[in-house]
Amino acid sequence: MLGLGYIGRKLFGTPNDRKVKRTRPLVAKINALEPAFEKLSDAEIVAKTRELQARAQAGESLDALLVEAFANCREAARRALGLRAFDTQLMGGIFLHQGNIAEMKTGEGKTLVATFPAYLNALAGKGVHIVTVNDYLARRDSEWMGKVYRHLGLTCGVVYPFQPDDEKRAAYGADITYATNNELGFDYLRDNMKSSVAEMYQRDHFFAIVDEVDSILIDEARTPLIISGPSQDRSDMYRTLDAYIPFLTEEHYKLDEKQRNATFTEEGNEFLEQKLQADGLLPEGQSLYDPESTTIVHHIGQALRAHKLFFKDQNYVVTDDEIVLIDEFTGRMMKGRRLSDGLHQAIEAKERVTIQPENVTLASVTFQNYFRLYEKLAGMTGTAVTEAEEFGDIYKLGVVEVPTNRPVARKDEHDRVYRTAKEKYAAVIEAIKTAHEKGQPTLVGTTSIEKSEMLSEMLKAEGLPHNVLNARQHEQEAQIVADAGRLGAITIATNMAGRGTDIQLGGNVEMKVQEEIAANPEAAPEEIRARIEAEHAAEKQKVIEAGGLFVLATERHESRRIDNQLRGRSGRQGDPGRSLFFLSLEDDLMRIFGSDRLEGVLSKLGMKEGEAIIHPWVNKSLERAQAKVEGRNFDWRKQLLKFDDVMNDQRKAVFGQRREIMETDEISEIVADMRQQVIDDLIDDFAPPKSYVDQWDIEGMRAAFIDHAGVDLPLADWAAEEGVDQDVLRERVTAALDAVMAQKTEAFGAETMRVIEKQILLQTIDAKWREHLVTLEHLRSVVGFRGYAQRDPLSEYKTESFQLFESMLDSLRYEVTKRLGQIRPMSDEERAEMLRQQAAALAAAEGAADPAEAPAPQPAAQVALAAAPGFVESDPTTWGEPSRNDPCPCGSGEKFKHCHGRLA
């Protein structure tokens, strides 16, 4: 009997069907304009862009311009690339412009789709960011689609790591900018560590289109981007504690593989206490439970996790004396990414490579909070529907399935479940051999480098030629993927998410043409292309007859979405194909999430060795397990976001205030307000309201103003006068400190004083924010234990982090007032002595034979900072944070960025 839901869908259609239906009239209007736009000259296409820009900037809505803009963009793409967008691609572009996630299957041309909403929104003049998962794709897409934008009269830039500053600023200043999610996030953090607006890279966050949006906004959501600096070196401690792990037995610890956590049992704690005390690392009578043991407990716990939960060639690789993490979702190496809390150092100790010092966080942001900065956000992926709830809850993004241009002809078969991994891999080899013999290309999906290389050895033993694509071979990635659809090809790959290159049946024509032209520069390119296209057509037909691409997965992933991405590599643009998952009860997902019931069923069925169970019930059971894991991960991310939102509000407040300070010339007013609050606080502390004069702590107040403002005030004389109360005292102190600052301003000059105030203010904000981040990290690590006392950890975190934030602001006011109180102009004698020392240092550096030139006179702002207590010219740690364009504090006369700043 048919359910009511099924009948309702047949009668009224699904919500997705209705969304698609609403775009059809717009697509029809765009198609109706096509003949007129085909007649335009190239110059007229650019003129159309200028007209649309003028209308957008005059206030006409982008929705009103959509039809003409899409028609213009389609014609430009046809001329620049020889590609005419399908109606389904126009639909995808419309959904993106409306701020949705467009789910488009592999091979449907997502790269071209993004040009339509990017062009339309760029007309507003605020810049559009197109976000990719790696630098290769950012460069490739900007170069490829840049031809379309230039044909339309717009500029296109690409952002990449270690790019020169001027080039990066120009890329962000372009109408459309391609960049990776990592680089965008790091540049946002770097911008908020700059000392002037002119040095910043990014404009306002207007509109971003995120490719592989599920990978970036869900898989990477829990990963914070952190800019950090080194802390003290503890490498000896990591090595020492690592040596204890091999002595542990299973009774000494408990593992939680679901949450990647490890804890010591009572037996384990007793064993470690005895060993550590015997070796002198733990004093006699001191327990691991004592507060003094916190550091040892933390680091030996991380050593346990490193050995028991993180595995070489699965979670990381060892290369060039370094531990490089592997992205569990894409199989790519993540160079430069490090685990926090000493875990990375514990893995380095385990693998006997050089241990890098732990880092202190200077600035951080999560992708969840970075991408929520944009006025409008959209995304593209082949698999989003399973995560629609999360996209809606966290990012307020709807998910729309865009129809394929041609119906999907891939056959998705039921999973085959074997009892043991040995039986499973034997069946996998047989299936690969059968497909290879009939010429069907096979893509074999594995979950780790270790398993991909084990399977490779098994295929070698059978004499089957194949390619392996994992984190070790990522340089040959494009070539391996391009060949994966050729007749009889066998390709073993770790997770294929975000690979960015389509597997085309018969091979990639364009790549083959470019290779041949490069190898035979004297041959006619047209002849090479014609020959290769003919060869490709013949090979493609044979592959189609063999059944198209066979996707063979050797394990299910925790996420259904990753499995669907792998399936989606087959059956692109209506091609035939087949997908099949081979599983065993020893697989991680089955083992961790309960294969006991299935084991019982298999036993009752009396299965023999090598036999598999194939039934829709098995698929449903596994998908339920995956849905449970996805739900748990979603809950984690949601909870983490609630905590991060607390810090995010504070981050936005600090970064916003910092930006205002960089943009304003009225610094003295901000500084005066801070000084006044310090005065009010100190007077309230030492001369409380409604107290008598003889109750005031005059000497304490005098010492406090000397310490915090650098001024010795005649407070005792003022207090002895008739009629002096707290208000009178406040007025006199304020007038005295204002007068001192006025004298300094006159001595330095108003412009120089403004520079000094701005530098001190920005440096102090940065230093205090860094300290605050460390404090919040510590609070975050311990607040979870409040749950044992029946208190809500999130509520406690909100309350205490707000108190810490207020305390940081108080400390900021005191520090700025104190540093400004300490600066003074140099006397002529001091200045002459400083110049003499600089000249001597230069002479020593350049050699006695070369007479040293007298160094260039330093700006007063630098002289003032040099005069501050604690400043040592030869010690960069006492220089504070000079602006990159300031003269270097070492006295070389060079700009900081060309001297010591270049080494930083």
Curated annotation (Swiss-Prot):
Q: Which of the seven top EC classes does this enzyme belong to?
A: translocase
Q: InterPro entries per the record?
A: Helicase_ATP-bd, Helicase_C-like, P-loop_NTPase, SEC_C_motif, SecA, SecA_CS, SecA_DEAD, SecA_motor_DEAD
Gene Ontology biological-process annotations: intracellular protein transmembrane transport; protein import; protein targeting; protein transport by the Sec complex
Question: What does it catalyze?
Answer: ATP + H2O + cellular proteinSide 1 = ADP + phosphate + cellular proteinSide 2
Give me the disulphide-bonded residues.
Answer: none
Report the locations given in the UniProt record.
Cell inner membrane; Cytoplasm
> Cytoplasm: present as a keyword of the record?
yes
Q: Keyword set for this entry?
A: ATP-binding, Cell inner membrane, Cell membrane, Cytoplasm, Membrane, Metal-binding, Nucleotide-binding, Protein transport, Translocase, Translocation, Transport, Zinc
| NCBIfam families hit by this protein | PRK12904.1, secA
Give the record's family classification.
Answer: Belongs to the SecA family.
Q: What is this protein called?
A: Protein translocase subunit SecA
> Which organism is the protein's source?
Rhodobacter capsulatus
